[in-house]
Amino acid sequence: GSTIGSVVDSWIVSSLAPTQRIEGPRLDSLRITSSTEGAVIPRVFGRMRMGGTIIWATDFREETRTTTQGGGKGGGGGKVKTTEYLYFASFAVALCEGPITGIGRIWADGKLLDTAGITWRWYPGDEAQTADPFITAKMGAANTPAYRGTAYVVFEDLPLSNYGNRLPQLSFEVFRPLADPDTAEGLTRAVTMIPASGEFAYATQAIRKGGGGAQVSENLNALSDTPDMVVALDRLQAIAPKVESVSLVVAWFGDDLRAGSCKVRPGVEVSAKSTTPASWSVNGVSRASAFLVSRDDQDRPIYGGTPSDFAVVQAIQVMKARGLRVTFYPFILMDVPPGNTLPNPYSDNAAETGQLAFPWRGRITCSPAAGFAGTVDKTATAASQVAALFGAATPASFSVSGQSVSWTGTSGDWGLRRMVLHYAHLCAAAGGVDAFLIGTEMPGLTTIRSSASAYPAVQAYRALAADVRSILGAGTKISYAANWSEYFGHQPQDGSGDVFFHLDPLWADPEIDFVGIDNYMPLSDWRNGFDHADAAEGWPAIYDRAYLQGNIAGGEGFDWFYASATDRSAQVRTAITDGAGKPWVFRTKDLRAWWSNPHYNRP
């Protein structure tokens, strides 16, 4: 009875106790009290972070939120009623003279603004833009200017609670390429999409790792609500609107410079990671069973992982949907870490221990390599090493289900053919691509000989091209992307004086549609200051257009070359000559002569 009485007493007392009321801060005025009249409208060229000027605003909108707490256990204790005042601002900010091509990041009070959930839009500032519909609804059509010629941004109901119930200081990343078509932005027609690695770098949907409230975005680094791939394409097309074609680079990992021992596999950054709404998978290989890339001395992965297959499909489809032509570019990153104990093929009898760390894929070759004691070059052993690198995959070694491609061949086959044919199937599953490369920059491989004049890798690439054609069909252009030092021929450095146009059988193959060259030919030999050869010839600067144009079909690789590193340091130049009267044979830059003249081997 006493317990019941106590509860009743508490209820009576609490019902008689006054309710405690707490109110948060409230603004005395809901108006923006300052503006700028007569401010200069800036001009922007390129990309710039800049502030702006408010050109229109409504009064702040006030929202009241009341919560009640208290009563205590059994109804005891007084109540606490809390009232908060929330404020929202709708306004427009003029940025610069238009037209601009895009807005990138936005900062509020110096911090990146998370635009997820915020209603905002931008106007380019051209002479055809129409009035903003939100401003029109507030002001009426007759009273709403279109602000033609001025780029501006409109925010609707921006929450102000994080900024002390005031408008934050806003700044914007603005893109405005030069109107002059004779600029990099105006002239660029094709680009390469890298980094080639990154497990979800090419995904067009947001990918998050972890579970519950601890999720972290994998591919929302540029903007908080837009995948990086989409941001990259938006900015590309805004900055370089004439771009028509994109090469999509996707990497697997090689682990040895010896062709006969090298495995080429898809890799991951960590072997255990949960991601949503999609998991990593390449060629049917799961994360747990994939090759794990090397890590540095701070336990960070040296490379990003191979892009997941679904991300590659998404990238191809989104680029095609934007009207871009897609070239697929398979890439090999060499994961040979420092301190390795692998036999070095670039040593006599391959007896030296330790290969160069993280080398260029173009150094994959036979072992021992040509030019070293014990070399297997020009022997049947070299051919068998090349065959081991390519592997035995066929177009039938894969299972295709929708947009998923899995391996059904021999489990230990990690050859080049498996990689390339996998991506041929994947590109077909994505709806096709405009061009497909069967290999890129492999001079150490393509110059391997099985006899004095037989190049087994060249024949292997021809067979691979035919298999890729059977998957992708006649609508896809197929080629090999030769290194700039590789495309024109092979001149063995053995004192023989031999000259072979070793890639000609590949270039002439009916399944090859064009000559592909990764062109990094030297365009200048300018040194610091003016005490050097090119300045002595009267050229005023490295940026001089005539100087650079003169080195397209001239200068290093055309008129002369450096015979050694010592000669390069001292600018001791050796003229390119040919006793047979055809110096173009040795000119890496002489594309015109290489294309125009008959090719004759000089064994």
What do the PLM-derived regions correspond to, one by one?
Residues 3-189, 194-200, 211, 215-218:
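Polar, S/T/G-rich
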Residues 189-210, 244-453, 477-485:
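Substrate-binding cleft and catalytic face of glycoside hydrolase catalytic domains
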Residues 4, 225-232, 308-315, 382, ...:
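Stable alpha-helical elements in mature extracytoplasmic
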Residues 81-99, 174, 213-241, 295-312, ...:
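Short linear interaction motifs
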